Curated annotation (Swiss-Prot):
Disulfide bonds: none annotated. With S4 and S5 plays an important role in translational accuracy. It comes from Acidovorax ebreus (strain TPSY). Signal peptide: none annotated. The lineage of its organism: Bacteria, Pseudomonadati, Pseudomonadota, Betaproteobacteria, Burkholderiales. This is Small ribosomal subunit protein uS12.
Length: 125
């Protein structure tokens, strides 16, 4: 425990909180252009081919972001909207691409959790 004299001389240092998604620069979403669309494999106990894209954001950052849902229509030079949010079993993937926005279509035939995948409400029969 410091003395009063030490506190007068030095003062307390405030802990700096490090951002979990620094490329967003405190914005909720960012627009970007896909530079590479590919699949990658997850960490140890899991096994799959996860769809990811390398995206060059409008602020100059180049990030790897995850494409959620079944199937997608992304190619190189597609314009996408990127949000924060990591993928636990993919190291280095700290962002998600927003479905149903800009060039990325929503998930087809999606019935539940539609808002997360940009799917329209199906026609009632």
């Amino acid at each position: 425990m410091p003395t009063i004299n030490q506190l007068v001389r030095q003062g307390r240092t405030v802990e700096v909180v490090k951002s979990k998604s620094p490329a967003m620069e405190n914005c909720p979403q960012r627009r970007g252009v896909c530079t590479r669309v590919y699949t990658t494999t997850p960490k140890k106990p899991n096994s799959a081919l996860r769809k990811v894209a390398k995206v060059r954001l409008t602020n100059g950052f180049e990030v790897i972001s995850y494409i959620g849902g079944e199937g997608h229509n992304l190619q190189e030079h597609s314009v996408v909207l990127v949000r924060g949010g990591r993928v636990k079993d993919l190291p280095g993937v700290r962002y998600h691409i927003v479905r149903g926005s800009l060039d990325l279509q929503g998930v087809k035939d999606r019935k539940q959790a539609r808002s997360k995948y940009g799917a329209k409400k199906p026609k009632a029969k």
